[in-house]
């Protein structure tokens, strides 16, 4: 957490390590990725999946979910203490799709969690390899971010649905550790805090007793994580107020909503990492790639290179557009759901269209859908250029943005102006400016008002040719400043339902 003065790179968070040098980090991230790949290969063998079936993204997701479920200790304990009819707490499973006589068939499988834990540990040199599990969680979270809207969740906590660019990582489980916290958006953490405060308001005992003490520690820790994401002194000072409150209530909720809104212009630092489906790592390991020896980085060229020569398939519903399905998965792979479409499109080398214009639903297929009517097609996950992922929000400035999403959260460290609709954002700040945080509020509003549209973020940073592995020749793209940059504009995506 930034507040304790220990800035670790993502890779260190990702691998749970202390400070390491670049080579050690590359090796330990490589070890984690190799472990996921070995696990996937072994599961395909156990399930007798053909090479083609093993490359199907839906099968990859089922296998990933099984291992996450096998290691979800809290839920496993809960299931054993509260047995529900027809559910075996010791088993996990899901749909596996097989190609039989030229048609896709769904088979529901059940596996002992113990057996899956054994396969996972065996693939990871006998260790629990929590970092690898978190990595899978982040891939699922990135896929959810690209696929679903969180309008309902935002409205429920009193936030504005147009603040969706702050909601990265909103479906990540609590147990995702430091690496999970790093990729959560400002809105996601504000929402978790608001939920806690609301429970405290409704339940007298929430902050009391031994349990309450633990709750309080969790509350303060979460406040520190959020504080560490803000880049201005006034925002951080306001977070100190929220954290130190004796009895958090509506005033703190107001402050958190204010801070979340302010992040539309004074952006927080949110980490971005390219987390790929397990089958991609499996394919690479199977073809003889030694991740630990070669080293790997989640924020450099490596994921791009991996996707350049991996063939992954997806089931496609009868009225879906395969190119749109590919865009959805590409965005998820690079954690680019809230990135400016102009930037994503330039890197990908293909037009990237807003969510509302995509003719595709999510990747996962519901149990009541007819699989036999579906075909499979190759996902086009290659890119024209690559760019370094950012862990900062870029500096602030503004420009015309859309009705659906009024700001972006940059993913790639590439020079551009960051679009946001100043009039819309500022309209939310009329009025409430009294109370103990008034001076900080005034300062924050002043900074937001002085943000300029022509300011460039990530100055001088560019994209790189895929042959330029050492990032020596940045190509700084020029963008049409008036073009639409928001993905969730005019949105008709499905809501995320747990």
UniProtKB/Swiss-Prot annotation:
<feature type="region of interest" description="Disordered">
    <location>
        <begin position="1"/>
        <end position="22"/>
    </location>
</feature>
<dbReference type="GO" id="GO:0005198">
    <property type="term" value="F:structural molecule activity"/>
</dbReference>
<keyword id="KW-0687">Ribonucleoprotein</keyword>
<keyword id="KW-0946">Virion</keyword>
<feature type="short sequence motif" description="Unconventional nuclear localization signal">
    <location>
        <begin position="1"/>
        <end position="18"/>
    </location>
</feature>
<feature type="compositionally biased region" description="Basic and acidic residues">
    <location>
        <begin position="8"/>
        <end position="22"/>
    </location>
</feature>
<dbReference type="GO" id="GO:0042025">
    <property type="term" value="C:host cell nucleus"/>
</dbReference>
<dbReference type="GO" id="GO:1990904">
    <property type="term" value="C:ribonucleoprotein complex"/>
</dbReference>
<protein>
    <recommendedName>
        <fullName>Nucleoprotein</fullName>
    </recommendedName>
</protein>
<keyword id="KW-0694">RNA-binding</keyword>
<comment type="subunit">
    <text>Homomultimerizes to form the nucleocapsid. May bind host exportin-1/XPO1. Binds to viral genomic RNA. Protein-RNA contacts are mediated by a combination of electrostatic interactions between positively charged residues and the phosphate backbone and planar interactions between aromatic side chains and bases.</text>
</comment>
<dbReference type="GO" id="GO:0043657">
    <property type="term" value="C:host cell"/>
</dbReference>
<keyword id="KW-0945">Host-virus interaction</keyword>
<keyword id="KW-1139">Helical capsid protein</keyword>
<dbReference type="InterPro" id="IPR002141">
    <property type="entry name" value="Flu_NP"/>
</dbReference>
<dbReference type="GO" id="GO:0046718">
    <property type="term" value="P:symbiont entry into host cell"/>
</dbReference>
<dbReference type="GO" id="GO:0019013">
    <property type="term" value="C:viral nucleocapsid"/>
</dbReference>
<comment type="similarity">
    <text>Belongs to the influenza viruses nucleoprotein family.</text>
</comment>
<keyword id="KW-1160">Virus entry into host cell</keyword>
<keyword id="KW-0167">Capsid protein</keyword>
<dbReference type="Pfam" id="PF00506">
    <property type="entry name" value="Flu_NP"/>
</dbReference>
<keyword id="KW-0543">Viral nucleoprotein</keyword>
<feature type="short sequence motif" description="Bipartite nuclear localization signal">
    <location>
        <begin position="198"/>
        <end position="216"/>
    </location>
</feature>
<dbReference type="GO" id="GO:0019029">
    <property type="term" value="C:helical viral capsid"/>
</dbReference>
<keyword id="KW-1048">Host nucleus</keyword>
<keyword id="KW-1163">Viral penetration into host nucleus</keyword>
<comment type="function">
    <text>Encapsidates the negative strand viral RNA, protecting it from nucleases. The encapsidated genomic RNA is termed the ribonucleoprotein (RNP) and serves as template for transcription and replication. The RNP needs to be localized in the host nucleus to start an infectious cycle, but is too large to diffuse through the nuclear pore complex. NP comprises at least 2 nuclear localization signals that are responsible for the active RNP import into the nucleus through cellular importin alpha/beta pathway.</text>
</comment>
<dbReference type="GO" id="GO:0075732">
    <property type="term" value="P:viral penetration into host nucleus"/>
</dbReference>
<dbReference type="GO" id="GO:0003723">
    <property type="term" value="F:RNA binding"/>
</dbReference>
């Amino acid at each position: 957490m930034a507040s304790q003065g220990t800035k670790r790179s993502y890779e260190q968070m990702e691998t749970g390590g202390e400070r390491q040098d670049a080579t050690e980090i590359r090796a330990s991230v490589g070890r984690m990725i190799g472990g996921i790949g070995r696990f996937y290969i072994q599961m395909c063998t156990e399930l007798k999946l053909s090479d083609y079936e093993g490359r199907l993204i839906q099968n990859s997701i089922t296998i990933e979910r099984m291992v996450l479920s096998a290691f979800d200790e809290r839920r496993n304990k809960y299931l054993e203490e509260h047995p529900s009819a027809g559910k075996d707490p010791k088993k996990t499973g899901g749909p596996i799709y097989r190609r039989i006589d030229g048609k896709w068939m769904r088979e529901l499988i059940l596996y002992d969690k113990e057996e899956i834990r054994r396969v996972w540990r065996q693939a990871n040199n006998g260790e629990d390899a929590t970092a690898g599990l978190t990595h899978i969680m982040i891939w699922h979270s990135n896929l959810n971010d690209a696929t679903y809207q969180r309008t309902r969740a935002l409205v429920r906590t009193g936030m504005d649905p147009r603040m969706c660019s702050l909601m990265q990582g909103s479906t990540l489980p609590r147990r995702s550790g430091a690496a999970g916290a790093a990729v959560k958006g400002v809105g996601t953490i504000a929402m978790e805090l608001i939920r806690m405060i609301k429970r405290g308001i409704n339940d007298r005992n929430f902050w009391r007793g031994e349990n309450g003490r633990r709750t309080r520690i969790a509350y303060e820790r979460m406040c520190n994580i959020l504080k560490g994401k803000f880049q201005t002194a006034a925002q951080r000072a306001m977070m100190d107020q929220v954290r130190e409150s004796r009895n958090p209530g509506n005033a703190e909720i107001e402050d958190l909503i204010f801070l979340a809104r302010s992040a539309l212009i004074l952006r927080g630092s949110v980490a971005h990492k390219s987390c790929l489906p397990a089958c991609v790592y499996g394919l690479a390991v199977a073809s003889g790639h030694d991740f630990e020896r070669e080293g790997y980085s989640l924020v450099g060229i490596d994921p791009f290179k991996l996707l350049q020569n991996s063939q992954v398939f997806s089931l496609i519903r009868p009225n879906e557009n395969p190119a749109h399905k590919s865009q959805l998965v590409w965005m998820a792979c690079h954690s680019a759901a809230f990135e400016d479409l102009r930037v994503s499109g330039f890197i990908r080398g293909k037009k990237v269209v807003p969510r509302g214009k995509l003719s595709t639903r999510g990747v996962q297929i519901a149990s009541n859908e007819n699989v036999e009517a579906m075909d499979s097609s190759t996902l086009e996950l290659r890119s024209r250029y690559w760019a370094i992922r950012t862990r900062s929000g870029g500096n602030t400035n503004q420009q015309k943005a859309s009705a659906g999403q009024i700001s972006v959260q940059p993913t790639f460290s590439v020079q551009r102006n960051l679009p946001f609709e100043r009039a819309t954002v500022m309209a939310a700040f009329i009025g409430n400016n009294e109370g103990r945080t008034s001076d900080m509020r005034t300062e924050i509003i002043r900074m937001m008002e002085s943000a300029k549209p022509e300011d460039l973020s990530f100055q001088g940073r560019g994209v790189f040719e895929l042959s330029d592995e050492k990032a020596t020749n940045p190509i700084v793209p020029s963008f049409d400043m008036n073009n639409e940059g928001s993905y969730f504009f005019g949105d008709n995506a499905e809501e995320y339902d747990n």
